[in-house]
Amino acid sequence: LEQLGRGSFLKRYTNTYSRDEEKLIQSVSKAVQYMAKRRIGALIVFEKETGLQDYIETGIPMNSDISQELLTNVFIPNTPLHDGAMIIQGSKIAVAASYLPLSDSVKISKSLGTRHRAAVGISEVSDAFTVVVSEETGDISVTFDGKLRRDISKDVFEELLAEHWFGAHFQKKGVNS
């Protein structure tokens, strides 16, 4: 009842992920929302079962804890790490500024740039989950299983991130749920 009174009950989720995982999800989500609002382009790859070592070797090693501030800072334009992809392994930022394969798919709109082609490309050759923030529009897109989902909401983004990063079914639970 105390949680209900404070409103925090409505913000809880129906899965079994840990507080650490929730903190990571929120750090990534806040960074992505911040960059989207300011049209700071970003490409973040979450390694799953398929190893991404070949692509990790093309980047600049970081081996850093994930934080909203670090995620945002890496993609600030005209800084040494902002071009290329950030690859996350588990709960660590493995590298930044890594090169990814570009998709040759004719299904990708010509209006989309290199970040989107790279996001689809890595999802065609691996099971990685990838987040793209468009510097042109500020839209947030994700790729997985060779598919691109464009212009998704914060809630959908968090749900997909949790599902693909931690395998959790991440849905907000309301009073009548």
Where is each model-derived feature located?
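Divalent-cation
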Residues: 1-177
